[in-house]
Amino acid sequence: DFADAAVGRSLTSLVAAEVKRGKLPGQGPNDVADAAGMVVLAMGKAGAGELNYSSDIDLICLFDDERYADDYAEARAAFIRVTRRMAALLSEPTGDGYVFRTDLRLRPDPSVTPVCLSMDAAERYYESLGRPWERAALIKARVMAGDQKAGQGFLDRLSPFVWRKHLD
């Protein structure tokens, strides 16, 4: 749908710019198609495919830290830039309006974490500190853009957190 296309196009164009600038170590033009390991998860109405004309989009941005074991800090900085620029590109008003209001606050502990964090850090957070409302929010989560395989793998690993056998 339109939201997926808008997020996907903005993500790949911004990742391509970072790759061209050499800011994503070891990544080249062939890595742009899967956003060089970055994933955008759609949450809430966007995740469920229930957007209406006034909906914002709730996104969680992650990157596959296994691809950047040797240059984690540089990759992390590049993905944070991509996320900030993507949110601005989608939500800043122009003469024609804006594409979507974009909310990045559903990520793990948004007051202290960067706008894009590693999948490993997010997974550790959910396993140790995840709250019931986060479990509920992840029910509708889906990979919206970026590295589909890595994103689906992340969601699969979170399945025991989301679908606990016992709620105590």
Q: Predicted segment positions?
A:
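A nucleotide- and high-energy phosphate-metabolite-utilizing enzyme signature
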Residues: 1-168
